[in-house]
Design a protein with these regions (language model features):
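PAPS-dependent sulfotransferases, especially Golgi type II membrane carbohydrate sulfotransferases
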Residues: 1-77, 85, 191-208, 215, ...
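PAPS-dependent sulfation machinery
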Residues: 126-233
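Short His-Asn-centered micro-motif
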Residues: 97-99, 234-238, 322
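Phosphate-binding P-loop
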Residues: 85-91
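Flexible, glycine/threonine-enriched loop-and-boundary segments that flank and lead into catalytic domains
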Residues: 229-253
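Conserved phosphate-donor/acceptor-positioning beta-strand/loop module used by diverse small-molecule
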Residues: 247-272
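Glycine-rich phosphate-binding P-loop
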Residues: 96-113
Length: 397
């Protein structure tokens, strides 16, 4: 049942969210740079008018947005008190990019076995800023909260593990860091077509400059916890498909591993995952709306990625087939290391083999869904993604 509109409006008033964040931080007022306020205004209006939030969903969304605003305030306060954070050089991440369900998580976590990579665990992306009652050296409160949230999500939506292997302590996507810009894919969580249309026209440079700022802050915290310095960051999120050109401009020595799989095997599964997330915030989200929006969004993302690929030096990219990642993950890892110019010795290869023995895809249940439920047909998917299939699936061989 949808929450009363007046309740949603009071919960998600943008000015009220900002004021609450200031109050929770004891009067901090510097939210940092970027168009976060305009983005927040558009996002909140769309959530209020279009998302059909339940009472629980509206309350959860309020906490999500206030928490992100609080993080912005705390992050800026740390940069003010420790200006050396801004001097941390992060310009050469190894970035795994592809549609969801193309083996990106498996590949990221396999490579993350190597301590030469800095990665962001789920708890770090969910709670990037210290909370009351903990120290930089011992982030126990954040870890406990993140573990409790993951456990709650699994209890409420057990099928989520068939879609994405959630674990608060393992490497995950930096998407939750990017969300702090408020220029992000809110349609991952709710039906916000007006916001999504606005987002399609935005310059995403501020998203990536803020992502770099967040990574600098996380790396600085890792040093405070005694984590050994790494060679480079390992990043991964499908959202980078929309902005490979911006990514490579903000991180000028980034190298990109592009993962490939037939969109007919990925887009419907992704719509199913999005529908699962929408159910956390709305009682009866329309699966057809989910399917239409994600099909259109991923078609735009793939088109943008193909255009960026044409404009950027070919040597910045490595193509990897999903089938190879599943059937020969260590062979794919070796190819990635060669591409990255990093040696892979026997000790590290053995560590990866041990990790695969414990965490292969065969350890997870299959994701069961109907493509028709989300309005897809095989013919439509073949038509909408014909250019990608003709070009990149063959090129990845």
């Amino acid at each position: 049942m949808n929450a009363p509109i007046d309740l949603v409006r009071s919960q998600l008033d943008a000015g009220g969210l900002l004021a609450e964040a200031v109050s929770r931080t004891g009067g901090l007022t510097a939210f940092g740079d970027g168009p976060y306020r305009e983005a927040l205004d558009v996002m909140c209006a769309s959530l209020i008018d279009e998302a059909g939030l339940s009472e629980r969903g509206a309350a959860m969304m309020r906490e999500k947005l206030v928490g992100q605003l609080v993080n912005r305030l705390v992050v800026e306060d740390y940069f003010r008190r420790h200006p050396e954070i801004a001097d941390i050089a992060i310009d050469d991440p190894l970035v795994i990019v592809g549609l969801p369900r193309t083996g990106t998580t498996l590949l990221q976590r396999l490579l993350a076995v190597d301590p030469r990579f800095h990665t962001a665990a789920w708890w770090e992306t969910r709670y990037p800023a210290p909370l009351a009652g903990e120290t930089l050296a011992e982030p126990a409160v954040r870890i406990a909260r993140a573990q409790a949230e993951v456990a709650t999500m699994i209890d409420c939506i057990p099928q989520i593990l068939t879609i994405h292997p959630l674990d608060a302590m393992l490497a995950d996507e930096e998407f939750m860091l990017m969300e702090h810009s408020f220029v992000c894919a809110m349609d991952s969580y709710a039906n916000v077509p007006r916001y999504t249309a606005w987002l399609a026209w935005q310059d995403l440079t501020p998203v990536y400059t803020y992502l770099k700022r967040m990574l600098q802050f996380l790396q600085w915290q890792k040093a405070r916890r005694g984590v050994a310095p790494a060679t480079r960051w390992l990043l991964k999120t499908p959202q980078h498909l929309h902005a490979l050109d911006v990514l490579c401009r903000v991180f000028p020595r980034a190298q990109v591993v592009l993962t490939h799989r037939d969109p007919a095997q990925t887009i419907p599964s992704m719509a199913s995952m999005a529908h699962t997330l929408w159910q956390m915030y709305a009682d009866d989200p329309d699966p057809l709306a989910v399917g239409a929006q994600w099909n259109a969004g991923m078609a735009r993302a793939i088109g943008a990625a193909m255009a960026a690929r044409d404009a950027l030096p070919a040597g910045r990219f490595l193509d990897v087939r999903f089938e190879d990642t599943v059937s020969n993950p260590l062979g794919v890892a070796e190819a990635v290391y060669a591409f990255a110019g990093m040696p892979l010795d026997a000790r590290r290869r053995t560590a990866m083999a041990d990790w695969m023995a414990r965490n292969g895809r065969d350890k997870r249940a299959a994701h069961d869904y109907s493509i028709a439920r989300f309005g897809f047909t095989d013919a439509q998917l073949a038509r909408d993604f014909a250019a990608y299939r003709a070009r990149h699936l063959r090129a990845a061989g």
